[in-house]
Amino acid sequence: MVTNDSLLSRLLPGLLVAAAIFAAWWLFIRAGDHPSVPNQAPGLLDAPSSVGPMLLQASQLGPTYDQSAQDTRATTSVEIRKGQSPAATKIIAHTWKAGARAGWSQVHGSITVLSRAELFTGSDLNAVSAGFERQMIHTYHGKPATAPGPLPGQHGWLLQGTTVSQIYSTLYTARRQVAVYGWQHGDVLAIVVVTGLPRDGVLQAATTLANAQDQNIGFVTRG
C-alpha cells in the first residue's frame, strides 16, 4: 500500500513542472503583443525638440530601416564648433540655437543614413556651411559630385567619397561608398549622409532624402 508521503514525493516533480508552465503562460498573456523586432529605445525624436521635426522621420525612411539610438541625439556646443574657422565660430557663438541628428540603417540591407539639422537666429551662414563641407571632405575623402536630380536649398554642396570607418566595418564591408549633401534653408543648415555598397546608388538616395528633409524644414519654419 502506497503511503501518503510516498505518493506526494512521486507527484511533486510533476506539480512543479505544471506550475512553471502555468506561470510562463500567464506572463505571456499579460505581456500582450510581441513584435518581431525589439522596441526601439527612446531617442531625441521621442521628446519635444525645436530641431527634431526638421530631421528625416521614421515614416519617410519606411519599415525597412531601424533608427539608431546612439546616432540620434542633440548636437553639442563642442561638436558645432569643431573644425570651424574663427569667422564661423563667431557666427556660431552669436546665432546658433540648437541642433540634432538622427541615424538609420537598413534592417536587411547595406544602406545607412544620417540626417542632421542646425538651427540659427540668422541666415549669414556661408562660413559655417563651408566648415561642415571641409569636415565631410576630410572624413569621407570626398570630392564634388554631379547630382542625379534636383537638389533643395541654397548654397548646397554635394560630395561623393568612401569610408573605412570601424563604425561601419563591424557590420558591413570595410570600404563603402558615401554621398553627402549639405544645404541652407533660411536659418537652418542641413546635412544628409548616405553610405552603402555600389549597388545601392548612394547619390540618388542622398538626393531623394535631402529633398524629403527639406520639405520637413520648410513645414516647420512656415508653421
Predicted stretch roles:
Residues 60-61, 145-223:
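A short, solvent-exposed beta-edge/loop patch
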Residues 30-105, 143-152, 160-163, 214-223:
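N-terminal "mature-domain start" segment
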Residues 12-30:
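Hydrophobic membrane-insertion alpha-helices, especially the h-region
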Residues 48, 52-58, 62, 117, ...:
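Extracytoplasmic/secreted envelope proteins and their assembly/folding machinery
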Residues 1-11:
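Short, low-complexity patches enriched in S/T/P/G
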Residues 132-136, 195-198:
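Short, solvent-exposed aromatic-acidic interface loops
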Residues 93-131:
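A short acidic-to-branched-hydrophobic micro-motif
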